Regions:
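Signature of N-terminal electron-transfer/Fe-S-associated modules in redox systems
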Residues: 1-197
């Protein structure tokens, strides 16, 4: 984890990406690029947005800085303080809770030795509670970085975290082998006819 920088500027690669993002919007509507630019700045800055990065985005878009702060503080996808290398976001909203997210939270607490809003002493893991990650049919689930881990139970959640601890890359997606968001027992409709057509 790093401290707050004194200044922020996009590196050469991200400056080109920022120009391309801004160019997607009509003249006069460049402020619409605020969310992707904040994401780009956050990715460049080890997963969090210091005030200087938000100010830089405001300058690029010709927006008052307060408008950028409003966006960054409203959406939970933006982190306003340093986070660990692996940001473990556990969904505890109703569908995940009904399917056992309390067990996932417990497994994460036990495996990582931290609670929501905390970072491990080695700076490797930050744990956050989220309201909804949009994969309700595959509940319970958690997001780590850009990857979704779905159809979890306490054992699979623990296995994912242990693999990350050892430097491995756990397989994202359903942990029960479910294909995307099909019913857990497999397709019940839209099956091929008996003739194979």
């Amino acid at each position: 984890m790093t401290g707050q920088p004194e200044t922020f500027a996009f590196n050469d690669e991200n400056a080109e990406k920022a120009k391309a993002l801004i160019a997607k919007y009509p003249v006069g509507w460049q402020a619409s690029a605020v969310m992707p630019l904040l994401d780009l700045a956050q990715r460049q800055n080890d997963g969090w947005l210091p005030k200087e990065a938000m100010d830089s985005v405001a300058g690029l878009l010709g927006m008052p800085p307060i408008r950028v702060y409003e966006v960054a503080t409203f959406y939970t996808m933006y982190n306003l303080k340093p986070i660990g290398k692996h940001h473990v976001q556990v969904c505890t909203n109703l569908p995940c809770w009904l399917r056992g997210s309390d067990a996932i939270v417990g497994a994460c607490r036990k495996s990582l030795g931290i609670d929501f809003g905390m970072t491990t002493e080695d700076g490797m893991f930050t744990m956050s509670e989220t309201e909804c990650l949009g994969a309700c049919v595959n509940a319970p689930m958690m997001q780590i970085g850009d990857d979704y881990y779905e159809d979890l139970d306490s054992d699979s959640a623990t296995a994912i975290l242990e693999k990350l601890k050892s430097g491995g890359a756990p397989k994202p997606g359903s942990q029960t082998g479910r294909h995307t968001c099909e019913p857990a027992g497999g397709l019940t409709t839209l099956k091929p006819s008996k003739g194979g057509k």
